[in-house]
A protein has these predicted regions:
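Catalytic-core signal marking the mid-to-C-terminal active-site face
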Residues: 1-115
């Protein structure tokens, strides 16, 4: 929430150029409506060095962790439907498998040095 008085507004930043803007907006809207419906109080505004803070909730650190979180999300299934969630799960699992198959230049250099 930014501004004050007549200039008070809610800012929603796009998550990234690779995100579907319609899906991102739909999920953001669903989250806001869920917060209103369930009277969820937002946390206090954070002040300080977010990188040094140890007690903040964390987002997944890898695609595998993100897939596991998505698999468990009943909220998102309710918000956008099982079919959409399953489609994205299939896509992300395929993406992870393809990533796992790649041998990086670091691996080549590191392990050819040892042989």
């Amino acid at each position: 929430v930014l501004g004050h008085g007549a200039g008070l507004r809610l800012e929603c930043r796009a998550p990234g150029a690779d995100a579907n803007p319609y899906l991102a907006f739909a999920v953001t809207l669903a989250a806001g409506l869920d917060g209103i419906k369930n009277q969820i109080e937002p946390p206090a505004m954070f002040e300080g060095d977010v990188y040094a803070a140890q007690d903040l909730p964390q987002v997944p650190h890898s695609l595998n962790e993100s897939i596991a979180a998505l698999e468990k999300s009943t909220w998102l299934r309710d918000a956008i439907g099982d079919d959409v969630v399953e489609l994205y799960l299939h896509f992300f699992r395929t993406e992870q498998r393809k990533f796992d198959e790649v041998v990086t230049s670091w691996e080549r250099a590191r392990y050819f040095e040892r042989s």
